[in-house]
Amino acid sequence: LAVAEQEASVTSLTSKRYILRFPALETLMLDDNRLSNPSCFASLAGLRRLKKLSLDENRIIRIPYLQQVQLSDESVDWNGGGGSPQKEPQFMLQSKPRMLEDSDEQLDYTVLPMKKDVDRTEVVFSSYPGFSTSETTKICSLPPIFEILPVKSLKARNQTLAPPFPELRYLSLAYNKIAKEDAVLPVALFPSLCEFVFHNNPLVAHTRGVPPLLKSFLQERLGIHLIRRKTVKPKHHVLMSRKESRKVKTEIPKVPKQPLVLHHPQVTTNKSPSKDMLEPEAELAEDLPTTKSTFVESEMPTESLEGLSLSRRTFVPLPPICSDSTVHSEETLSHLSDTAVRLSPEHPSDEDSKSTESIFLTQVSELPSSIIHKDDLELKEKDQKKPPTAPREVKVTRRKLTTASLPSKYHGYEELLTAKPDPAFIEPKGIQKNAQALQHMLKHPLLCHSSKPKLDTLQKPYVPKEKRAQRIPIPPPRKTRTQLLDDIFIRLRDPRNITEAPLGAVLHRRTERRLVNHKQYLEAKRLLKEFQARYRQLVSGSLRTVFGTTPLPPACPALSESQPKFGRFLEFMDEFCQEPTASDSQG
């Protein structure tokens, strides 16, 4: 390279001419080379186009302060002299020709960059027939030489001198042995540095965050991006090619819409309808127009045939509702059809129709004969097992008595007492109990001691334990129905967002634990201040009553209005510490 160390003789260098070497070198990676001497920075500082320098996994302890060696005026003419140096950009990397001087003969040769590859060089002798003198136009004066200076003797930078690494933008010193912040500060002398990597060094191994001196001086003032952690490269997304042969082409058929089948509620309880009920129905049938009667007559035989074939249907599907005026006429038609079905001997009794009543949102068109036969057998068994009407009335009276004993706010919730949980329902369990169990297992590990006796240690004498009679636990008092309903309501609310903690334990925690639950600590302090203020107010009011002075009205607003959690306790304190009346004071 076109740089020399401190021990190089400056006088011998100034008497020679130099040419460009490695003019297009922009990236240099010297990883894992066991570099430890700071002079390697002085050797590389003359590379004028170097933009990226990587020195990872070496033994570098510090970055030295570099300053250009000042030579005579004739030799320091770096930017002037000749036509070719003016065409090249400022601070161009240059290299020297090597002259071999012997006592017998002097070989004149020149080191030039290759035409095919600019980063490589070739030696051209002057005696070679293809040697051209036009290459001498690239020869210029000596490039800058940098030396390492101690911090105490560091001078103010001269603007005429070339700075070290003028175009270096990326410097990586990861996996080295840098332990102090001062060892990295010379990076500020590199004018174009944008990014500095120094992770996995002793400087940042046991600390958190960027060191303060580097953050204030390099990052905030000079705008250098500091990287103290190893960046993980994102993984590329794997794209799976879609195969047309594996594509599902089946389509789900659309379900055709069918009119809903509505069941008319049956009000009659007797097996045989009375004559009083049949007479108004007959009158209604006579008043209806002839057109609708024909419609009903045409509808009835088809429905009766279908009812006989399919599970003895006791209903007739209603026609679509067209307007509000036709609603009443359709209701009367359905009522007449129900009564006609009841009077027909082919259909079952009212109790059978009650047992088969159910509400469906879909209409089944076809059913197998086996299912219909099973339904008929089940209906017959239910009719045989029906108890008499007397115990039903007793049960109803008992229910009325129990509901009358409960307060009014519990009416309608009596089913919760007799409700049985669904056996197929699995109660969801959160992750909190699992985490607590895991923490308990980690804090209390199971130690399996060896069964062999330890003869080296002091043996403890055997002391038999005293057997104590176990106390028979007293059964808890039986809860009333209101208490059971209150417990059910509390379980339904499930107040998981309320955290209970002793006030003294929260206030006397250490600083580290306070930072974890800072919100809880602030709320505890606020509650304590409110309690102290109310306590002082109560004490002052009691002292005024003792000494006969009238207590002043409270200046602070009611705390129960602003804080509902603490309001109940304050109301209780107000009622407990009320002012005594005149009759009490006289007595």
UniProtKB/Swiss-Prot annotation:
Q: List the disulfide bonds.
A: none
This protein's UniProt keywords: Coiled coil, Cytoplasm, Leucine-rich repeat, Nucleus, Repeat
Q: Cell inner membrane: is it a keyword of this entry?
A: no
Q: Where in the cell is it found?
A: Cytoplasm; Nucleus
* InterPro entries according to UniProt: Leu-rich_rpt (IPR001611), LRR_dom_sf (IPR032675)
- Major place of localization? cytoplasm
Coiled-coil regions, chain positions: 518-540
- Where do the segments described as Disordered lie? 337-357, 373-396
> An example of a Gene Ontology BP annotation on this entry?
response to X-ray
GO annotation, cellular component aspect: cytoplasm; nucleus
Give tissue specificity per the record.
Expressed predominantly in testis.
State where composition is biased (Basic and acidic residues). Answer: 344-355
The answer to whether UniProt assigns keyword Lipid biosynthesis to this entry is no
Q: Where are the LRR repeats?
A: 24-45, 49-70
Tell me the superkingdom of the source. Answer: Eukaryota
> Which function does this protein serve?
May be involved in the response of cells to X-ray radiation.
Q: What's the protein name?
A: X-ray radiation resistance-associated protein 1
Q: Which organism is it from?
A: Macaca fascicularis
Give the encoding gene's name: XRRA1
